[in-house]
């Protein structure tokens, strides 16, 4: 055997050497093999029987009897012993096993379309395909290929029994050429029924191929993926065979014995062998015969398929090898100066095909295609060859002065007279190295094409000789000239050549220009905005420079200050203290004030001037413009706010504290000596108080007229602004005093110049005129001051207001008021309307006539018309249009046909019934006037009634006073109460009290806000959704919105639809009041439709897409969202989350898992997927040995494959090969069949199967426990309840709308009804709160129990997962360290084949602890775990149902209470609105009754109408009900008591902490007893203190713990009260405050508890310290015994000892008491926890409360008004 193996290796080496020789002689190719070998995981089938569960299938046999059926179970890989019924796709790979026909691949029953796909890792050359079927061959199929890893597919060939039917568009028959796609019927017949083959040859040998390397042929024979699509099964017709129809599909399926895909590694003729691809296992891990995909390239080629040349082998183009032409790649020729090159086809063609390699990165200063010439700046050494590394010498030329930057002559040429290394100078350069400028030139430069430049000095700016610096070229310039050529002026000068010194100064304005720099050409300075002129001293058109007094603040617009000035005196009997006095200009006299006029200020009063328009931080002088009315001086006190300074301003004295100044009576302006500093963007206020220091009787009524307050900027506060000379001129000419005066001003030139400059500086330019377009003549204004040219009677700097005594500013100016001197109170009128202030009975714009109803201007009197006329002649007083049937100048008598005395107040009444007897409208027998009552009594005819027979009887209408209008029945379309005498007018027939929401003269129309048919009594309220209609369509106050009176359709906002405008249109969502809906904006490519969820805007995404707009890939999908999202093809059990890369789709395997789909265990791990435990440590050793052997065998297999076609050349070896084959077969038989029969493992296998079934059942039960599948039903129920609540909410909205339109009587009734409902609901909620809290605590306890049981179940599951039976021998080896396939005696423990004393097999019991015993124990544990989990499942489900029921009921109760609270609030608001309407109605009635000239019959009618109003309940009861509601709404205030109580408890805990610290301090004193004997006397005192402290400490601890418990209870109560308060009121701020207080109380309670624990800890420390005290006392006693103390001292010491021992005993007793208290507290906690057991009793109460609340809610929903 060893000899044969050596022979194999020797022959393999010979074959390899021969293959290398073949590559040297021409084209060479790798051997062809089966591409399926070693690619089990890359072979996939779309359908396999029994993958998810065992599946029955039948075969066509026993035609006369019952058909024969079998089971397919492919959940585990095929194993001849354990899994013989597994028919996965990897069974079709040829393995040369003896019993080959016992395994095959089989599809699911009855499927026509099934595909098999092979995914290769690289591009392979495909030869042919052979399929061997177990069943009938397919009736139709096709074979496809892909060369781009499955992105695009091409068909190889179609196969079908009936090509015309299966593939109608495909040509059938023989192919006419290579690669023709045809349909072949040769391999699709029904015979044979088994063992039939389908063969596909890529290149038909019947066709001659001229160029096998053409792109067409190469594309035909290469592939990366192969797909076989079965499209139709052969069916034989069950009716003919008498089969049952219900299982006819069980016998039709695809079954395949073998699949051979012959091919080789594709290497373009440049390799004879291949190796595994990168990132794949090498030969040591590959099965024998596997065809690898990475070429081992020859001929200087490279790449996976040898598709390119190696680096530096680029001299010729790459070509595939063909026959004897190897077309090897040639190396480049670079003269030893480069190791890199590339191929250039243009160079190759230009050389005639000799050389195409271009060298890269030439070294040694060389360049060129072959690095055969020197680089620029170098030249060739004639004494050295070009391949010499020092052949190129650098040039010695100045690069700045030579042509081409220092390049010299590269080589000598006698013909041209050039010498190698010679420099080539530029035109203006000279020298051997070209490093000098020629005369009268300068500046040798590399950028200058001439090398040097001529001097070129400007004659206007330079001295009269043309020379310059050789290096810089600088010419010699005049005084104010600069530049290299003296061609420009220096900064601050302009006009080259126009001045003796070369240039003129700029002279820019110091304020109008930014600097003193100007244009050197024209001298234009850089002006600030809106400033013009060469020197920037003129404003632009429409702009001006502000004067000194520009910042004026009118006293009339200032705020009056309340109170007296600090330095002023009181003023009595004068009010108000400040009064505005308008100044009226006198023609011909100058105006001495600004603004409308003055502010008349009394002594002690003040004015506040608001200053917020400061443009620049600067010091200002305050100027006050005033006029005194007496010879006495006044005093002002000034306060500036805010007073603080900043980086720009330093606080002045005036700004730091109030200052007083005198206002002389002889002047009209006062400039305060102390300046103030103001800056921009600050709101200042300047308070000015006025007073008279010497106020006597003669000045009691004195006052001062204040015009304005001005701020004058100080020029000296501007830094670096002007020179000292300018400041001197400014002060010399008194610029400030002149510019501050009122009236026309004539400024000196120096003042005007400096003021203009300062204005431009402060305002950063000129200020806009802003002349009023109607009040001014034009848009321009004065250069300094900005005064616009005003039209007549128009004043103001901008001409924007009328002068005093005029009005109506327009294009014509203003009009004078012309108020009548007798009719008006003043000569000044309103400046907008022109209305003069008239006296009481005077009217008219000018107050020049009497009011209506008055006469005799200017002494206007009321018209004397006896109240029967309103108007009279304004001059004579004669009455117009007398009423009441009166006549005369003063309406003092009755007209003809009436009687009465108007002068005495008796109205005129007709003595008619109703007309006079001579007319046709007389409906009485007679008429008379009662002398006592003065009543006119008519005796009416039949059919008429009334005092004057002027009315129809009840049930009739008409107007007897009009001819032809008899009384008729009221026609109101059945929409009135016919028994009501006031339901319609008996005179006109007009319907007055329409019912059923109707209106109109005949009740024929629906009311506004209603729709339907009034004739059919179907008028209904418009149900428009308030958010979906335009607010213009809904009346204010909550009334019904308008809708179509017939259909009820509401006017919807944009993109809103529905009859009630209650939903968004398709493709829109988010209904917003007043704006409508917004677009869904769903991605049309990835969403199912353009519609989206109307609440969330979520678009309905297609499968695989997510995001709100479906613009993202869904989790567990990958790809490009705009293009395509592909599901991750990964095994979830073997992946992490997310399971694949979102961009590439590559599966993310967890540790220990591998495979493209993460569906198998990685090498080095057990193959029990998905657990994949790491193998034993010995695995690595064996794996190395097996890999070495596998590699050797694989080499032999390749050798055998190469020698397969050369068997005829080695006849002498045929016998040896035959012997070797026999030996190999024998070895395979021995390896596959163990030394003992398989029947010995049957009993073990049965236990294995039983345990596995138990594990599967337990897994299913655990899934049920963990997943709570019935939660889905709970969620569905919750959704249904939410839908019902939504419907109820809509009903409540409709109810609210009806309530808002109800009458006061209905609202009162509803308030009473809803109050009872809300009171009942509030009571139920209060009762429910404790139940809900108890339920929540119980639910938490149950969840704790559930977690405990779950952890136990997880532990059982983990134990079960450890029970695995991969293989009997491997399992025994892992358990006992030995495979167990030998007798039991030498083993450390019993194996799988243990025997007893009598030789019988023993597989359990003592001494046999192998896999069988382990399986038996595992089965027993699994059964126990199964029972535990079943009980756990029942308990968990019962508890979960109870928790969900209670939770749902509590949630429903909470929601119902919230709804009731909201309804009650709405009704309360409605009642308030109705109350306001009633008050308004009562006010109107009172005003009506108080009016004069109201007829008595109208008053009587109104009184009767008011008396007819009846409330449903007495007013006192209604008031009581409203008071109760208000009391309930104020319940939140009661929580303040709880807050105070908790604060007191916290204070008590803090005091207790102080006492505990005092006790600690007292205990520390005891520690110093060892210092002196005298301190022992303090022990007794300390003992007393300690006793009292511990006693108090114990009591305080008990009290604190009680307080803690009480605080916790109050906290829980406050939480429930907070929830109740939140239901009663919508005041979110109040709730937030209460929650903050609650959190503070909780913190206090926690702190108190912590302090109590700290006090207990201190008591324990006190005990320890006392023990230490005893020790120190003992030490001290020993010391005293040695020193010999006196008897007295020893007695005192003994007393102290006894006292200390007593103190210790007392301390220990108190510690025990504290311990007992702690135990009691724990017992109380346990008792509180036990109360949770009352949940079962409370459940019934919660259900009853819920039902009652639901019933009340239903009753409330039916309470429509």
Swiss-Prot record:
Domain of life: Eukaryota
Stretches for region Domain II: 1175-1375
Residue spans crossing the bilayer: none
Location within or outside the cell: Secreted, Extracellular space, Extracellular matrix, Basement membrane
Database matches in Pfam families: EGF_laminin, EGF_LMN_ATRN, LAMB1, LAMB4, LAMININ_IV_B, Laminin_N
Keywords, comma-separated and alphabetical: Basement membrane, Cell adhesion, Coiled coil, Disulfide bond, Extracellular matrix, Glycoprotein, Laminin EGF-like domain, Repeat, Secreted, Signal
Domain Laminin N-terminal: 24-264
GO cellular component: basement membrane; extracellular region
One example of a Gene Ontology biological process annotation: cell adhesion
Residues linked to a glycan: 169, 229, 246, 1016, 1055, 1223, 1301, 1326, 1333, 1354, 1469, 1517, 1587, 1596, 1609, 1725
Chain spans, region Domain I: 1409-1761
Cited PANTHER family: LAMININ SUBUNIT BETA-1, NETRIN/LAMININ-RELATED
Domain notes: The alpha-helical domains I and II are thought to interact with other laminin chains to form a coiled coil structure. Domains VI and IV are globular.
Annotated function: Binding to cells via a high affinity receptor, laminin is thought to mediate the attachment, migration and organization of cells into tissues during embryonic development by interacting with other extracellular matrix components.
Quaternary context: Laminin is a complex glycoprotein, consisting of three different polypeptide chains (alpha, beta, gamma), which are bound to each other by disulfide bonds into a cross-shaped molecule comprising one long and three short arms with globules at each end.
Protein's UniProt name: Laminin subunit beta-4
Organism: Homo sapiens (Human)
Chain's gene name: LAMB4
């Amino acid at each position: 055997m060893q000899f044969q193996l050596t022979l194999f290796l020797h022959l393999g080496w010979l074959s390899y050497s021969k293959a290398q020789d073949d590559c040297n002689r021409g084209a060479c190719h790798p051997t062809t093999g089966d591409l399926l070998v070693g690619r089990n995981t890359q072979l996939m089938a779309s359908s396999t029987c029994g993958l998810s569960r065992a599946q029955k299938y039948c075969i066509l046999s026993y035609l006369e009897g019952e058909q024969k059926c079998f089971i397919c179970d492919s959940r585990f890989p095929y194993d001849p012993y354990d899994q013989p019924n597994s028919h996965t796709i990897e069974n079709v790979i040829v393995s040369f096993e003896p019993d080959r026909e016992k395994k095959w691949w089989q599809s699911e029953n009855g499927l026509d379309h099934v595909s098999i796909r092979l995914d290769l890792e690289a591009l392979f050359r495909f030869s042919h395909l052979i399929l061997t079927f177990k069943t009938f061959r397919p009736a139709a199929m096709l074979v496809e290929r892909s060369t781009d890893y499955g992105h695009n597919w091409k068909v190889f060939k179609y196969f079908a029994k009936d090509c015309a039917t299966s593939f109608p568009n495909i040509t059938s028959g023989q192919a006419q050429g290579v690669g023709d796609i045809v349909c072949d019927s040769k391999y699709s017949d029904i015979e044979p029924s088994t063992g039939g083959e389908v063969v596909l040859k890529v290149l038909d040998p019947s066709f001659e191929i001229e160029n096998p390397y053409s792109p067409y042929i190469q594309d035909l024979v290469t592939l990366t993926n192969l797909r076989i699509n079965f499209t139709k099964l052969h069916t034989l017709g069950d009716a003919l065979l008498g089969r049952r129809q219900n299982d006819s599909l069980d016998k039709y399926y695809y079954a395949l014995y073998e699949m051979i895909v012959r091919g080789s590694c594709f290497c373009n003729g440049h390799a004879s062998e291949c190796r595994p691809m990168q990132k794949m296992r090498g030969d040591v891990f590959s099965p024998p015969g596997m065809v690898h995909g990475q070429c081992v390239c020859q001929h200087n080629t490279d790449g996976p398929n040898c598709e390119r040349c190696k680096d530096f082998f680029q001299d010729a183009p790459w070509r595939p090898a063909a026959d004897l032409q190897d077309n090897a790649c040639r190396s480049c020729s670079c003269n030893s100066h480069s190791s890199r090159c590339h191929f250039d086809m243009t160079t190759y063609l230009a050389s005639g095909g000799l050389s195409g390699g271009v060298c890269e990165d030439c070294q040694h200063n060389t360049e060129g295609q072959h690095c055969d010439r020197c680089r620029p700046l170098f030249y060739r050494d004639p004494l050295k060859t070009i391949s010499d590394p020092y052949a190129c010498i650098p040039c010695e030329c100045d690069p700045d002065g030579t042509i081409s930057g220092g390049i010299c002559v590269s080589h000598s040429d006698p013909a041209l007279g050039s010498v190698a290394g010679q420099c080539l100078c530029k035109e203006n350069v000279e020298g051997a190295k070209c490093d000098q400028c020629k005369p009268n030139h300068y500046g040798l430069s590399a950028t200058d094409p001439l090398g040097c430049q001529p001097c070129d000095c400007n004659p206007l700016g330079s001295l009269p000789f043309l020379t310059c610096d050789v290096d810089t070229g600088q010419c010699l310039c005049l005084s104010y000239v600069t530049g290299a050529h003296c061609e420009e002026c220096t900064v601050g000068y302009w006009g080259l050549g126009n001045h003796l010194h070369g240039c003129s100064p700029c002279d820019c304005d110091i304020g109008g220009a930014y600097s003193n720099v100007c244009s050197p050409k024209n001298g234009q300075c850089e002006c600030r905005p809106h400033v013009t002129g060469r020197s920037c001293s003129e404003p632009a058109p429409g702009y001006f420079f502000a004067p000194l007094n520009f910042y004026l603040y009118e006293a009339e617009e200032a705020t009056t200050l309340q109170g007296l000035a600090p330095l002023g005196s009181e003023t009595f009997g004068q009010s108000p203290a400040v009064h505005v006095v308008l100044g009226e200009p006198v023609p011909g006299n100058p105006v001495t004030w600004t603004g409308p006029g003055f502010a008349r200020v009394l002594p002690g009063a003040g004015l506040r001037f608001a200053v917020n328009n400061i443009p620049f931080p600067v010091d200002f002088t305050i100027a006050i413009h005033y006029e005194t009315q007496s010879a006495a001086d006044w005093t002002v006190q000034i306060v500036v706010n805010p007073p603080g300074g900043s980086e720009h301003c330093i606080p002045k004295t005036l700004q730091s504290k109030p200052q007083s100044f005198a206002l002389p009576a002889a002047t009209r302006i006062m400039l305060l000596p102390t300046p103030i500093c103001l800056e921009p963007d600050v709101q200042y206020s300047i308070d000015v108080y006025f007073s008279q220091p010497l106020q006597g009787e003669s000045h009691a009524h004195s006052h001062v007229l204040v015009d304005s307050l001005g701020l004058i900027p100080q020029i000296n506060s501007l830094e670096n602004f002007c020179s000292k000379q300018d400041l001197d001129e400014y002060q010399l000419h008194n610029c400030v005093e002149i510019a501050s005066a009122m009236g026309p001003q004539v400024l000196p030139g120096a003042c005007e110049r400096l003021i203009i400059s300062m204005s431009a500086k402060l305002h950063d330019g000129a200020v806009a005129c802003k002349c009023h377009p109607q009040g001014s003549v034009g848009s321009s204004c004065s250069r300094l001051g900005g005064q616009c040219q005003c039209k007549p009677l128009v004043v103001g700097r901008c001409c924007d207001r009328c002068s005093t005594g005029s009005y109506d500013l327009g294009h014509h100016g203003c009009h004078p008021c012309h108020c009548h001197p007798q009719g008006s109170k003043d000569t000044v009128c309103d400046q907008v309307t022109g209305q003069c202030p008239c006296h009481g009975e005077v009217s008219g714009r000018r107050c020049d006539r009497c009011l209506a109803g008055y006469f005799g201007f200017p002494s206007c009197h009321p018209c004397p018309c006896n109240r029967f006329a309103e108007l009279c002649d304004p001059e004579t007083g004669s009455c117009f249009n007398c009423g009441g049937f009166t006549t005369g100048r003063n309406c003092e008598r009755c007209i003809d046909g009436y009687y009465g005395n108007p002068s005495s107040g008796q109205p005129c009444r007709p003595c008619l019934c109703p007309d006079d007897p001579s007319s046709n409208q007389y409906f009485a027998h007679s008429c008379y006037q009662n002398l006592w009552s003065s009543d006119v009594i008519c005796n009416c005819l039949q059919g008429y009634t009334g005092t004057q027979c002027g009315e129809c009887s009840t049930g009739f209408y008409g107007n007897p006073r009009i001819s032809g209008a008899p009384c008729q029945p009221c026609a109101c379309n059945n929409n009135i109460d016919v028994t009501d005498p006031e339901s319609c007018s008996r005179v006109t027939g007009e319907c007055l009290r329409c019912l059923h929401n109707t209106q109109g003269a005949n009740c024929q129309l629906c009311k506004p806000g209603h729709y339907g048919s009034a004739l059919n009594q179907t008028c209904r309220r418009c149900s428009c959704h308030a958010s979906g209609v335009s607010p213009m369509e809904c009346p204010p106050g909550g009334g019904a919105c308008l809708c179509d009176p017939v259909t009820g359709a509401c006017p919807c906002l944009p993109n809103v639809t529905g009859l009630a405008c209650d939903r968004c249109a398709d493709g829109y969502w988010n209904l917003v009041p007043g704006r409508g809906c917004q677009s869904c904006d769903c991605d049309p490519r990835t969403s199912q439709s353009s519609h989206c969820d109307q609440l969330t805007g979520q678009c309905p995404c297609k499968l695989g897409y997510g995001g709100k707009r479906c613009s993202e890939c869904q989790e567990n999908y990958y790809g490009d969202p705009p293009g395509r999202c592909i599901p991750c093809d990964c095994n979830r059990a073997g992946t992490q989350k997310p399971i694949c890369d979102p961009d590439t789709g590559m599966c993310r395997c967890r540790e220990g898992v591998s495979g493209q789909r993460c569906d198998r265990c990685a090498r080095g791990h057990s193959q029990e997927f998905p657990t994949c435990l790491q193998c034993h440590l010995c695995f690595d050793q064996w794996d190395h040995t097996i890999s070495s052997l596998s590699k050797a065998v694989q080499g032999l297999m390749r050798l055998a494959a190469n020698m397969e076609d050369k068997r005829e050349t080695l006849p002498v070896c045929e016998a040896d090969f035959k012997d070797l084959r026999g030996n190999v077969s024998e070895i395979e038989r021995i390896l596959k069949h163990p030394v003992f029969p398989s029947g010995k493992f049957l009993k073990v296998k049965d236990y294995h199967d039983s345990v596995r079934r138990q594990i599967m059942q337990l897994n299913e039960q655990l899934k049920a426990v963990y997943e709570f599948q019935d939660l889905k039903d709970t969620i569905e129920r919750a959704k249904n309840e939410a839908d019902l609540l939504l419907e109820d909410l809509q009903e409540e909205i409709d109810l609210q709308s009806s309530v808002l339109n109800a009458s006061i009587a209905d609202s009162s009734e509803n308030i009473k009804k809803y109050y009872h409902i809300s009171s009942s609901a509030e009571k139920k909620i209060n009762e429910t709160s404790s139940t809900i809290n108890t339920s929540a605590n119980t639910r938490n306890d149950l969840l704790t129990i559930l977690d405990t049981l779950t952890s136990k179940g997880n532990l059982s599951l983990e134990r079960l997962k450890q029970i695995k039976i991969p293989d009997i021998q491997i399992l025994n080896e892992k358990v006992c360290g030995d495979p167990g396939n030998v007798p039991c005696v030498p083993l450390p423990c019993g194996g799988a084949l243990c025997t007893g004393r009598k030789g019988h097999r023993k597989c359990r019991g003592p001494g046999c602890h192998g896999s069988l015993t382990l399986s038996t124990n595992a089965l027993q544990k699994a059964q126990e775990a199964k029972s535990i989990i079943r009980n756990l499942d029942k308990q968990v489900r019962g508890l979960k149902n109870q928790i969900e029921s209670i939770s749902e009921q509590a949630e429903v109760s909470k929601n119902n209470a919230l709804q009731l609270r909201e309804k009650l609030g709405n009704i309360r608001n409605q009642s308030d609105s109705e109350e306001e309407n009633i008050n308004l109605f009562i006010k109107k009635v009172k005003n009506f009754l108080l009016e004069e000239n109201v007829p008595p019959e109208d008053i009587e009618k109104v009184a009767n109408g008011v008396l007819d109003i009846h409330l449903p309940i007495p007013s006192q009861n209604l008031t009581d009900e409203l008071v109760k509601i208000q009391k309930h709404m104020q319940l939140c205030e009661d929580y303040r008591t709880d807050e105070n109580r908790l604060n007191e408890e916290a204070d008590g805990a803090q005091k207790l902490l102080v006492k505990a610290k005092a006790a600690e301090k007292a205990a520390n004193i005891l520690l110093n007893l060892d210092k002196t004997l005298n301190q022992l006397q303090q022990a007794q005192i300390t003992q007393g203190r300690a006793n009292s402290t511990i006693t108090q400490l114990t009591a305080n601890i008990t009290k604190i713990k009680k307080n803690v418990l009480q605080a916790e209870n109050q906290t829980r109560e406050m939480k429930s009260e907070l929830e109740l308060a939140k239901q009663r009121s919508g005041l979110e701020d109040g709730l937030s405050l209460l929650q903050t207080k609650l959190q503070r109380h909780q913190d206090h309670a926690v702190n108190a508890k912590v302090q109590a624990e700290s006090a207990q800890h201190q008591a324990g420390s006190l005990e320890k310290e006392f023990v230490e005290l005893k020790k120190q006392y003992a030490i001290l006693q020993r010391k005293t015994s040695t020193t010999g103390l006196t008897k007295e001292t020893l007695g005192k010491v003994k007393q102290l000892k006894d006292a200390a021992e007593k103190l210790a005993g007392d301390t220990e007793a108190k510690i025990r008491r504290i311990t007992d208290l702690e135990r009691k507290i724990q017992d109380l906690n346990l008792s509180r926890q036990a109360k949770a057991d009352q949940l079962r009793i409370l459940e019934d109460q919660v259900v009853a409360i819920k039902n009652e609340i639901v019933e009340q809610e239903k009753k409330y929903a039916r309470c429509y008004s």
